[in-house]
Amino acid sequence: MSGSKCCSSSNTIKVSIYLFLHTLTYGLLNYHLNPRLLASTGVVESDIPYWMSYLSIIMHVGQSLLLQKFNLGYGWLLLTKYPVYVLLSTYYLTPLSQIAWAFIIDAISLLVARCFSRANPIKCSNQVNTQYSVSFLFTIMASVLISVLNYISQKIFLNGLILGNSHNVVTSLVAPPLPLQYLAHVPIGYVIQRVVFSERPIPQSLFLMIFLTLWNCFIPYSILFSMNWSAMFQVVGAYLSQIWIITFICWALSL
């Protein structure tokens, strides 16, 4: 009994060290190295509130605790955080170099925390073992579906809401060609099919998905895009609805 308590106490200490190091590294790198991801969208650095960096760190801590609480895998970070980068690169033409900085910062903060704490508190949930061919098939199917739906919604959004003309075709300069979107959405497609084949109930997975996506995308960026909050809400809402549709399609096909 005492051995079990000792093991539990040791694991708690490791998790605490991990979360502390991860948050500290993430905060320092974002504060000093991140070249203002949203600068290219027309947001002037002087217009960004000084507390925005601290809000980002606090939200990151909350997300880490939630991932640990529900025993979610790192793949959920892809599913719930990186769609906003796809949206920014699509609608606001954010340079890929700035998006790459965000990937690098996340990767370094995770590596530092794991190396120095020797802990991996966020473990992948128990999942049903599937054949690689089936996993690959569902990944490709999900990435293609989300790319097509995203491309269609871009045209409708840009034509109907921004340009005010639903009959003219929007130039491909604004919306990336579909082959590039296929590649960008492969990681998202992979995570979606893992969600479908996990032992976690689909309704719970979808609830966590929408909550974490709004947590990462809508809350901080609605502050910066307060003058165009309705547009940002519709963009994020469209992306969420696509993920829901694709999840249900994959789930139905897996029955």
UniProtKB/Swiss-Prot annotation:
GO terms for molecular function: telomere-nuclear envelope anchor activity. One of its GO terms (cellular component) is endoplasmic reticulum membrane. Connects telomeres to the nuclear envelop (NE) during both vegetative growth and meiosis. This connection ensures clustering of telomeres to the spindle pole body (SPB) when cells enter meiotic prophase. The chain crosses the membrane at residues 13-33, 48-68, 72-94, 99-116, 132-152, 172-192, 205-225, 235-255. It comes from Schizosaccharomyces pombe (strain 972 / ATCC 24843). Disulfide bonds: none annotated. The keyword Nucleus applies. Its main location: endoplasmic reticulum. It is a multi-pass membrane protein. One of its GO terms (biological process) is meiotic telomere clustering. Keywords: Cell cycle, Cell division, Chromosome partition, Endoplasmic reticulum, Meiosis, Membrane, Nucleus, Transmembrane, Transmembrane helix. It is found in: Endoplasmic reticulum membrane; Nucleus inner membrane. This is Bouquet formation protein 3. The keyword Protease does not apply.
